[in-house]
């Protein structure tokens, strides 16, 4: 593939049909997709499982898979697209799970769609919203939109760069919190 040429997202991702039919995963393995935190364990993130009576039809999500959630969020009325960086698990049938094709980088895909404007512009023509604000789009149709991706080596470099930048931001945020606590403690001690 030539770099930076317009192609369908389906050139980079394929719909995963892996289901939990063997019961390999249970309710403790159910994952949710968060706009802020990505793909997370539902119980750890929300305090409980919202899974149905049976998780056998749920889709299996492996590390590196890309997931599209058909749930509207304030900044993303057509849903969000995230890559699983954590443990394997399962998602409700309301989610679409995609395998990353050879020559594609799942981390890059996530960062490509990290920009709300780009994500919304991509999904809007593909998604029909129902009367109850639910998403009317097949897993396959999500792959029919146009994207412009670089070559695989460039995708890898770009994805790694933004991952490192996110890690640096996280470290700086922790340092900021420590400094705020220190300031508060010193002010209390000074004026006690």
Each PLM stretch: what is its role?
Residues 1-6, 145, 151-192:
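Amphipathic alpha-helical segments with low aromatic content
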Residues 10, 20-52:
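DNA target-recognition patches
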Residues 88-94, 129-153:
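A short glycine-rich beta-alpha junction/loop motif
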């Amino acid at each position: 593939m030539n770099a930076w040429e317009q192609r369908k997202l389906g050139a980079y991702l394929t719909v995963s049909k892996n289901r939990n039919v063997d019961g390999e995963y249970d309710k403790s393995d159910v994952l949710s997709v968060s706009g802020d935190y990505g793909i997370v364990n539902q119980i750890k993130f929300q305090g409980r499982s919202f899974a149905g009576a049976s998780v056998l039809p749920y889709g299996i999500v492996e590390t590196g898979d890309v997931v599209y959630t058909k749930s509207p969020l304030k900044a993303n009325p057509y849903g969000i697209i995230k890559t699983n960086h954590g443990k394997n698990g399962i998602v409700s049938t309301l989610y679409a799970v995609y395998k990353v094709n050879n020559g594609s980088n799942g981390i890059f895909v996530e960062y490509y769609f990290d920009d709300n404007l780009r994500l919304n512009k991509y999904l809007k023509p593909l998604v029909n919203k129902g009367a109850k604000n639910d998403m009317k789009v097949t897993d396959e149709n999500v792959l029919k939109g146009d994207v412009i991706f670089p070559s695989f080596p460039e995708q890898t470099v770009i994805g790694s760069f933004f991952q490192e930048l996110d890690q640096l931001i996280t470290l700086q945020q922790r340092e900021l919190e420590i400094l705020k606590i220190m300031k508060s403690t010193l002010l209390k001690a000074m004026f006690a």
